[in-house]
Amino acid sequence: MTSQLAKKAEAWSARFNEPVSDLVKRYTASVFFDKRLALFDIQGSLAHAAMLAKQGIIAEADRAAIEQGMAQIRQEIEAGTFEWKLDLEDVHLNIEARLTAMAGDAGKRLHTGRSRNDQVATDIRLWLRSEIDNIVGLLKALRGALLDLAEQHTNTIVPGFTHLQVAQPVVFGHHLLAYVEMFTRDTERMLDARRRVNRLPLGAAALAGTSYPIDREFVAQQLGFEGVCRNSLDAVSDRDFAIEFCAAAALIMTHVSRFSEELVLWMSPRVGFIDIADRFCTGSSIMPQKKNPDVPELARGKTGRVNGHLIGLLTLMKGQPLAYNKDNQEDKEPLFDTVDTVVDTLRIFADMVPGITVKADAMRAAALQGYATATDLADYLVKRGLPFRDAHEAVAHAVRACDDLRCDLADLSVAQLRDICGLGDKANLIGDDVHTVLTLEGSVASRNHIGGTAPEQVKQAIAFARAALAE
């Protein structure tokens, strides 16, 4: 029996009387997707080995042999020559088997005081911390690109919409700054999530800790963690840090999706506000005239995919008792795909934004439609003593009359406005200066406060956002 069991590949096989079926091996193996954690697995193992040697749990010679073997394994992985084996289940046992083949008993001693449960939790946190740093950098690049475009359009007037109906005129730079604000909060969320990712689970072992005299704080310091997970059961079993990351990622993609929707609308010939550079568009196999905004369209679609991963991870965790369960193997593919999707999307959008051509004349022409300055006329009357609700009603009468006359408010004479607004003996509240508030420039200039669309405020907001970006 001993000789038969010795032939089994699994590190845990001595407990069993028959080998695992090939179907189960394929069903339970994770090596073909968790191998992307390999370099972080090595990083964690080196810190663990250093701690074991420091604490006298293994000999210094064993630590040196482990370090030498891991250096060779790293080279093989980076060169693409490392042989990944399905029989060895996952990234951890593949690396351990290769290490043992090179370092002998020293390799077998590496797993002392450790379980794959706390090992994989450590690997994921190391990997995710690195990816968060990358995503934060990409968010900053996108914010910078939007600020550059906004700075070019602090006086370009575009209609602002509610319910996709023309509402009030704004400057295009102000519109773009709304997305800068969104992506700034996304950056803050990522950095906040990083704090909870940046805790060391290693040392929790399978679930209850270990009887060896380990030094978890030393390992945390070696790996750059801010501290250790304070409860061994929690350390190996929960993936809330990954779920929190995916929630923040879903919000990033939601903001990208909203921006994408507007890009698609703006590029439509029916709107014609912008053009997107050819390198970000595709054509049609049948319609030779087509230039399709595939990148923003696909970003909208990929947002649903990322949202689905978030729901999948929440569902994965909701029914698990403490501590670790095999269910958690299913955390990696949605997490990996979320990171890949967000990274690719942010990278391409940061490159695409500078190539947007703004058609300012079309924006202005659209802003002159739909009575965009109606609120300005109401405010004009309020400032002359009319209660706002009465002013609102008076301007509504004027808008209805313009519908019948097929003209804009600015096309009406002072006499027509006095007659149409139905103000009776208060008609003289409409003075000869009324048309100054009915111009697009007058409208945007009047919103001269923090957060408003006045060009000077937009310039100040851009400066503020650039300072925040530099922090």
UniProtKB/Swiss-Prot annotation:
Q: In which pathway does it act?
A: Amino-acid biosynthesis; L-arginine biosynthesis; L-arginine from L-ornithine and carbamoyl phosphate: step 3/3
Query: Annotated Gene Ontology MF terms?
Result: argininosuccinate lyase activity
The enzyme's first-digit EC class, named in words, is lyase
The gene from which this protein is expressed is argH
Tell me which Gene3D superfamilies the record gives: Fumarase/aspartase (C-terminal domain), Fumarase/aspartase (Central domain), Fumarase/aspartase (N-terminal domain)
Q: Which Pfam families match?
A: ASL_C2, Lyase_1
Q: Which reaction does it catalyse?
A: 2-(N(omega)-L-arginino)succinate = fumarate + L-arginine
Q: What is its EC number?
A: 4.3.2.1
Q: Name one GO cellular component term.
A: cytosol
What organism is the protein native to?
A: Ralstonia pickettii (strain 12J)
* PROSITE patterns per the UniProt record, alphabetical: FUMARATE_LYASES
Q: Which UniProt keywords apply?
A: Amino-acid biosynthesis, Arginine biosynthesis, Cytoplasm, Lyase
In the record, the note on similarity to other proteins reads: Belongs to the lyase 1 family. Argininosuccinate lyase subfamily.
- Location of this chain's protein in the cell: Cytoplasm
The protein's name in its UniProt record:
Argininosuccinate lyase
Q: Which GO terms fall under biological process for this protein? A: arginine biosynthetic process via ornithine; L-arginine biosynthetic process
NCBIfam families, per database record: argH
